[in-house]
Curated annotation (Swiss-Prot):
SUPFAM superfamilies: Concanavalin A-like lectins/glucanases. Residues 39-168 form the Galectin domain. The modification Phosphoserine is found at S22, S25. This is Galectin-related protein. It comes from Homo sapiens (Human). InterPro entries: ConA-like_dom_sf (IPR013320), Galectin-like (IPR044156), Galectin_CRD (IPR001079). The lineage of its organism: Eukaryota, Metazoa, Chordata, Craniata, Vertebrata. Disulfide bonds: none annotated. The gene is LGALSL.
Length: 172
């Protein structure tokens, strides 16, 4: 898995299996940057900790049904890795669902949001900020909700998985 995902002008690289990025210049929707393959699975170097932020920028597909962004404890499929937080955008219901899955048991799903922030064929920016008691989730710079930690060992949350009806343009 070592090597560069894209050429030297790329923003995101996978080196030695670790997700790294360059935040030296602002990203605009009309600037070219390589598409990352969906479904995507990447390692979060050092795992999560208070103050650490995960950034996902992308473009929603033209006719989307749903997409999901998950932070997990590893990438195991059998047994499945614990899911610290899964964000699932469901376009038919205009919902942004949140949940966790620990030892195969799904937690209580949360769905309340002030508005549905995603628009088909439009870019978006999701930031997941890890704080001591919770994740704070922002979309396009606006805080949408808090999700209180259900996994207490934050450093074990070391993988990001993205799938569904979107194109990823930047990860950080």
């Amino acid at each position: 898995m070592a090597g560069s995902v894209a050429d030297s002008d790329a923003v995101v690289k996978l080196d030695d299996g670790h997700l790294n990025n360059s935040l030296s210049s602002p990203v605009q929707a009309d600037v070219y940057f390589p598409r990352l393959i969906v479904p995507f699975c990447g390692h979060i170097k050092g795992g999560m900790r208070p103050g650490k932020k995960v950034l996902v920028m992308g473009i929603v597909d033209l006719n989307p049904e749903s997409f999901a962004i998950s932070l997990t404890c590893g990438d195991s499929e059998d047994p499945p890795a614990d899911v610290a937080i899964e964000l699932k955008a469901v376009f038919t219901d205009r919902q942004l669902l949140r949940n966790s899955c620990i030892s195969g048991e799904r937690g209580e799903e949360q769905s309340a949001i002030p508005y549905f922030p995603f628009i088909p064929d439009q870019p978006f920016r999701v930031e997941i900020l890890c704080e001591h008691p919770r994740f704070r989730v922002f979309v396009d710079g606006h805080q949408l909700f808090d999700f209180y930690h259900r996994i207490q060992t934050l450093s074990a949350i070391d993988t990001i998985k993205i799938n569904g009806d979107l194109q990823i343009t930047k990860l950080g």
